[in-house]
A protein has these predicted regions:
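Short, hydrophobic beta-strand segments that form beta-sheet elements in well-ordered domains
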Residues: 4-6, 24-32, 65
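Flexible, glycine-rich beta-alpha linker
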Residues: 145-155
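Rossmann-fold cofactor-recognition segment
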Residues: 32-51, 71
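N-terminal Rossmann NAD(P)H-binding glycine-rich loop of SDR-like oxidoreductase domains
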Residues: 1-24
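Active-site Tyr-X1-5-Lys
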Residues: 118-143
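SDR active-site strand-loop-helix element
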Residues: 7, 30, 68, 94-99, ...
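Conserved Rossmann-fold NAD(P)-dependent oxidoreductase catalytic core, especially the SDR/UDP-sugar
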Residues: 82-120
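NAD(P)-cofactor binding segment of oxidoreductase domains
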Residues: 56-95
Length: 155
């Protein structure tokens, strides 16, 4: 059975993906502060500022990593650089959940998959920085998903 690791599986998007994929794949996830995940043996505590992702990956042995992480931008950039290096030298793949904010400068025009990214927001520029790092990988090694605004159940 294919093994999947969802980074940020305690968040809204990550947990929704975990619940959907768990029935079909050997699925693992990370959590930071959410209570109730510590007893789940498929969840690992992960503090992005302290690291420890390497040991989680060694234990989970994923063939696919889904990044739904959030946190301080610099720590996220370092974590994704680690993931890119890992994926470049293994048979693992990455799905990176980015944002439509990479196009927020073009608010009066539609944006398409292959359009040049340009953002006025700090968040959009941060996502562009990680996307540009991913472009150095072989295309078969990653999938880039640009999500629009996502609202929770009670929004």
């Amino acid at each position: 059975m294919k093994r999947i690791l969802i980074l940020g599986a305690s968040g809204f998007i990550g947990n929704t993906l975990y619940k959907e994929l768990n029935s079909y794949y050997k699925t693992f996830g990370t959590y930071f502060t959410k209570k109730g995940f510590g007893q789940n043996h498929h969840f690992f505590h992960f503090d992005i500022e302290e690291g420890g992702l390497e040991s989680i990956i060694k234990e989970a042995k994923p063939k696919l990593i889904i990044s739904a992480l959030r946190g301080p931008f610099e720590a996220l950039i370092e974590t994704h650089q680690f993931l890119i290096d890992l994926i470049d030298n293994s048979n693992c793949r990455l799905i990176f959940l980015s944002s439509a904010n990479v196009f927020d400068t073009f608010e009066h025009f539609p944006s398409y998959e292959y359009d040049k990214t340009l953002s006025e927001s700090i968040y959009g520029r941060f996502k562009i920085k990680i996307e540009n790092k991913l472009l150095r990988l072989a295309p078969a090694k990653y999938i880039l998903v640009r999500l629009p605004m996502v609202f929770g159940n009670h929004s």
